[in-house]
C-alpha cells in the first residue's frame, strides 16, 4: 500500500434523529446535499421538512386560464409554488402581484423568485394581509385572475420556533406575522373557560372541547405559564385520559391538531380576514375575471361557499363552482397534506 496515498475523506456524520440543534434533525432541510433522502420522503407521500409542495396546481391553472399580458394576484405567496407557475403562464408579459402576511418567509420567497429571474418588471411582492386586496387593486387596476391558498405552509409548520406544531418543542406562538398581535400563549392568559370551549368548537369542531378547556384554564388558575407547544400538548393529553386505551393515542393526536388549529385561527383573526377578503374581492376583478380559492378547513370552505353563492344570486358572479373540487387521488397519495384541500372558483359577470 502506498503510504503517500491521500487519506479517504469521511462523509460528514449525520447527527441522528434527535440532535441538539433542530436544523440538523432532518436531512430534507439540506435538499442539495441529501437529494436522495428528499426523494424518498416524497415517494412515501410525505412533505420534506422545511419544504412546501403546492396543491391542486393543475386544477387551478386549468381554471384560471392565464394568458400573457394579463394582470393577476397571488393573495397568499407562501413558498411561491403557485406564484412560479402563474409567472410561467404570463411568459414575461403582464404583471403578477403577490402578497403574504408572513414577515419571515416572504423575503426568502422573494429572493428565491428573483434568483429565477422574476424581478419587479413582472412581479410585485408586498407584505400585507389579503383582507387589504382593495389596496392592491388601486395600484394594479382590475385583476384578470386571483388565487388564494388558505393553507398554512409546510415551512411554518416544520419550524418549531414558530410554534405551529405540537410535535416539536417550541414557543406557543402560532402567529402568521410574529411582529403583530399577541401569541397563543398570551391569548390563553386572557380567555375564560367558556370562551375557550367556544373557540375550540367553532374553529375546530373539537368534540372534547369541554374537557380540554377545563384542563387548560385549571392550569392557568394555578399560576402555570403555558408558554411552549409541548406544555399544551401534555395538558391536552392529560385531559383525555378517560378515552379508551385502544383509541386514546389517535384521539389525542387529532385533538392536539384541532386545538392548535383553533388557537391559530383565533390569534390571526383568520375567519374575519377571510370574510373581509371575500367581501372586497368582486370589486377588484375585471369583467370575466377569475378567482380560485383553496381551503383546508370546513369553516373556511363554508365562508367561501356562502360568499360565492350570495354574489352569484346578486348577479355579481356569472358562474361559480357547483361543488368543491378535491385533489386527485394520485396527488393525495404522494402528498398527504393535500387530502383535506377543497378548491372553489368563481367568474366575475
Swiss-Prot record:
It catalyses: cytidine(1402) in 16S rRNA + S-adenosyl-L-methionine = N(4)-methylcytidine(1402) in 16S rRNA + S-adenosyl-L-homocysteine + H(+). S-adenosyl-L-methionine binds at residues 80-82, 100, 130, 149, 156. The keyword Repeat does not apply. One of its GO terms (molecular function) is rRNA (cytosine-N4-)-methyltransferase activity. The keyword Transferase applies. InterPro entries: RsmH, SAM-dep_MeTrfase_MraW_recog, SAM-dependent_MTases_sf. Keywords: Cytoplasm, Methyltransferase, rRNA processing, S-adenosyl-L-methionine, Transferase. Its EC number is 2.1.1.199. It holds the Pfam family Methyltransf_5. It comes from the Bacteria. It is an enzyme of class 2 (transferase). Belongs to the methyltransferase superfamily. RsmH family. Specifically methylates the N4 position of cytidine in position 1402 (C1402) of 16S rRNA. This is Ribosomal RNA small subunit methyltransferase H 2. It comes from Alkaliphilus metalliredigens (strain QYMF). The lineage of its organism: Bacteria, Bacillati, Bacillota, Clostridia, Peptostreptococcales.
Amino acid at each position: 500500500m502506498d503510504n503517500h496515498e491521500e487519506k479517504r475523506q469521511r462523509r460528514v456524520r449525520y447527527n441522528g434523529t434527535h440532535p441538539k440543534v433542530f436544523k440538523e434533525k432532518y436531512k430534507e432541510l439540506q435538499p442539495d446535499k441529501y437529494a436522495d433522502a428528499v426523494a424518498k420522503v416524497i415517494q412515501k407521500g410525505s412533505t420534506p421538512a422545511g419544504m412546501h409542495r403546492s396543491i391542486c396546481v393543475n386544477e387551478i391553472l386549468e381554471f384560471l386560464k392565464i394568458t400573457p399580458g394579463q394582470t393577476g394576484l397571488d393573495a397568499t405567496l407562501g413558498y411561491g409554488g403557485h406564484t412560479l407557475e402563474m409567472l410561467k403562464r404570463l411568459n414575461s408579459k403582464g404583471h403578477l402581484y403577490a402578497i403574504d402576511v408572513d414577515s419571515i418567509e416572504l423575503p426568502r420567497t422573494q429572493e428565491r423568485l428573483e434568483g429565477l429571474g422574476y424581478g419587479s418588471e413582472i412581479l410585485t411582492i408586498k407584505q400585507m394581509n389579503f383582507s387589504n386586496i382593495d389596496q392592491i387593486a388601486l395600484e394594479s387596476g382590475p385583476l384578470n385572475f386571483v388565487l388564494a391558498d388558505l393553507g398554512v405552509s409546510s415551512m411554518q409548520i416544520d419550524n418549531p420556533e414558530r410554534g405551529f406544531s405540537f410535535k416539536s418543542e417550541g414557543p406557543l406562538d402560532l402567529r402568521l406575522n410574529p411582529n403583530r398581535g399577541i401569541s397563543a400563549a398570551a391569548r390563553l392568559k386572557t380567555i375564560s373557560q367558556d370562551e375557550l370551549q367556544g373557540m375550540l368548537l367553532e374553529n375546530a369542531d373539537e368534540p372534547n372541547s369541554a374537557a380540554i378547556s377545563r384542563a387548560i384554564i385549571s392550569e392557568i388558575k394555578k399560576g402555570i405559564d403555558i408558554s411552549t407547544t409541548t406544555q399544551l400538548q401534555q395538558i391536552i393529553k392529560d385531559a383525555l385520559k378517560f378515552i379508551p386505551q385502544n383509541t386514546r393515542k389517535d384521539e389525542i393526536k387529532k385533538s392536539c391538531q384541532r386545538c392548535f388549529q383553533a388557537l391559530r385561527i383565533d390569534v390571526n383573526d383568520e375567519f374575519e380576514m377571510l370574510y373581509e377578503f371575500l367581501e372586497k374581492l368582486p370589486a377588484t376583478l375585471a369583467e370575466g375575471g377569475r378567482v380560485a380559492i383553496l381551503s383546508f378547513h370546513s369553516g373556511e370552505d363554508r365562508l367561501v361557499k356562502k360568499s360565492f353563492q350570495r354574489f352569484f344570486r346578486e348577479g355579481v358572479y356569472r358562474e361559480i363552482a357547483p361543488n368543491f373540487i378535491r385533489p386527485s387521488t394520485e396527488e393525495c397519495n404522494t402528498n398527504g397534506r393535500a387530502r383535506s384541500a377543497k378548491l372553489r372558483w368563481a367568474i366575475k359577470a
